[in-house]
């Protein structure tokens, strides 16, 4: 088993990471300053570093030995400034949390691509003319870390829509508002379903192709990729390969300590 090296280092990468949220040593700090710092370069300091969470700390391991920030995962293919990383933040477990969303909102006054009205607000028709309006418009994202997914009732649904009572005045049978937290693009080789509801799983299609379809649809739906901007098979392959090489797991528990010591096999390398 590979052991995580715990050491202080100075590295550069084009990513927003927490300064004191990542820690090294025998125990996590008493508290975390989540203020992001901007770093630049090709490879990031994520590999082998431990980021605090509610029960201790977790770490990311890529089978390539580093997380490549030049990968298509970190590039924008749409029209609204988003990348995959917008909703899949490494320091927050490759997803978003209310704390991370609030941090981004406060730093950008709610103008970050994360808060685009196509799915970052409670309704696509909501008012975003002022910071107060933007805060109200993205309340589900700010308070619960949830992205709005608009889907029609599927033909095979085992239910019928009897009535609509939407406080945000948008949902209908043609566009249900489903609020969900983005799933981490890590530990994917262990999965047999893509998406919360499995809608990217198609009969006779491999998991690789399911993931490629998900990446393609994400750039269309969440990043608002234009119809004429076709993604090549090489780009989709790059994203899927990147994701399937990522593994994430708890490395430190507040009660048990380091999970790879005293015979323990904790951590993403396991």
Task: Name each region found by the language model.
Residues 28-270:
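Periplasmic c-type cytochrome electron-transfer domains
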Residues 2-13:
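Bacterial N-terminal signal peptides that target proteins for export
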Residues 1-2, 174:
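Short intrinsically disordered, low-complexity coil segments enriched in acidic
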Residues 3, 16-18, 115:
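Compositionally biased amphipathic helical and low-complexity segments enriched in hydrophobic
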Residues 11-22:
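Bacterial N-terminal signal peptides
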